[in-house]
């Protein structure tokens, strides 16, 4: 029998943030640190628009493409999405009961994933596209999923996206 697949449909995106090194990637920005107050308005950071209030994006067949929301304000096709950057995506998924699940992720570059404020994955994958399966426990009701994804100036820099599918496993 094929397992039931859930995927968050709507994501709140925040960013981009400077991310040139592992130290930068480990820097806690306001989406992952509730003690940091989000700015009230948009502001400029290193030649790119930094989004303080969320931009909402609907997933397309489980995919969230950061490049659609964080393109630089330059004309033409050169450098359309920021490199040496990271951004966050936040969504909720509802569960009818406490249950074990597997999060299937597809992504490029570095990623961190939290479920209900618990860090469940850190991956500093540098070469091409990667897939990871993460066992998690969903609680009855709303479950928060927060993803931080980087984009670097490498051969795959045009791919600043991730796919998130949740396979239910009955307890």
Predicted regions located by residue number:
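Beta-strand elements of well-folded, non-transmembrane domains
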Residues: 91-95, 109, 151-153
